[in-house]
């Protein structure tokens, strides 16, 4: 599954109006833990076989979204369901914890 680049322009359509849960990854290219997390999220998306959208928000490019969600530390993961943020995690987490967070949001 390709990564979905989320911007201020497509946030409402891709996240708030999504018919499936969305896992957002707030990251930066220079962030070591963010780089470690990226393949984990890709793997999780593959395992969910289209039942989960995974979107990436570059906080350096999308400062408006970073401020809107009060991102003070990265990586930060937020799960959206039915247009609402239902779970949040800050820092690197193993795939099992992220999967549990997503499942808990269903």
Roles of regions detected by a PLM:
Residues 73-106:
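Non-catalytic, surface beta->alpha helical segment in thiol-disulfide oxidoreductase systems
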Residues 26-40:
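Conserved redox-active cysteine motifs that mediate thiol-disulfide chemistry
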């Amino acid at each position: 599954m390709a990564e979905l680049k989320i911007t201020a322009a497509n946030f409402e359509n891709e996240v708030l109006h999504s018919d499936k849960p969305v896992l957002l990854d707030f990251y930066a290219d220079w962030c070591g833990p963010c780089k470690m997390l990226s393949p984990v999220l890709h793997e999780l998306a593959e395992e969910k076989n289209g039942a989960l959208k995974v979107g990436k928000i570059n906080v350096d490019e999308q400062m408006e979204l970073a401020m809107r969600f009060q991102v003070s530390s990265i990586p930060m993961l937020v799960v959206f369901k039915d247009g609402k943020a239902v779970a949040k995690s800050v820092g690197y987490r193993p795939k099992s914890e992220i999967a549990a967070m997503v499942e808990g949001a269903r």
